[in-house]
Amino acid sequence: RTLQFMQNYLFFQEVTIDDIYTVRQMLEPELAAGAVPHLTEADFEALEHSISCCDPTQSHEDLLTQRREDVNFHDILAAANPNPFQRFSCELINEMIRQLIVFGNRTPQTEHRRFGEANAQFHRDIVQAARARDAERVRVLMHQHMQDAASSVKRMKGRIQGRLILDADTLRRPRPVAGRKRA
C-alpha cells in the first residue's frame, strides 16, 4: 500500500536525475554500512556473481543488462540490511533507476564501458571491505561510488524517460540465494 501511495505522489512530480542521486548519495552509504554485520557467505557469493555480470571485462551481456545487474548489487546489500524503511527506500530508488534512466544514442560505447568498469571496481572494493567487516570503509567506498555514478550518468547525458509507474509487485528482489540466513 505504501508503494502505491509513493507511486501516486511521484507520478505527479518532476523527478530529475539530480533528485534521485542526491537521495541515493545519502542513503546508499548508510544502507551498505548497516548491511555489513548481516552479510552471509551466500550474500557474498551473490555480490561476486553480480560483479562478474556487470563488469564489461568479464561479461558478455549487453550494456543494458550489465547496468541492471549493477543495480542488483545494491539490492543484494539492501536485502541484508535489517532496517526495513531504509531497505524499502533504496529498493524504490533502484527500481526508478532501472525503469526511468536512459542514455542517448550518442553516448559512445567506450563511455558505457568505462562506467561499467568503474562500477565493478567499486563493487569489488566494497565486497573486500565488507568481508573484512569494516563497515566504515564500506560507507566511505559507497559514498565515493555514488558520487562517481552521479557524475558518470551526467557525463553520459543520462535522462529520465517517462514517469514512475509501479504496482505492489514491481519492486524487484535480488535473485534468491540458497542457504540465506539472517544474522
List each model region and its residues:
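General structural signal for secondary-structure boundaries
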Residues: Q13-T16, S59, E111
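Short helix-coil transition/hinge motifs at the ends and kinks of transmembrane helices
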Residues: R106-R114
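Short linear sequence motifs
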Residues: T2, E14, Q66-R67, G116
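Conserved amphipathic alpha-helical segments that form helical-bundle/coiled-coil interaction surfaces
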Residues: I20-G104, N119-Q128, R137-S152, M156
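C-terminal effector-binding regulatory domain of bacterial HTH transcription factors
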Residues: A135-A183
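Short linear motifs at protein or domain termini
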Residues: R1-L27, A33, P37, Q161-R163, ...
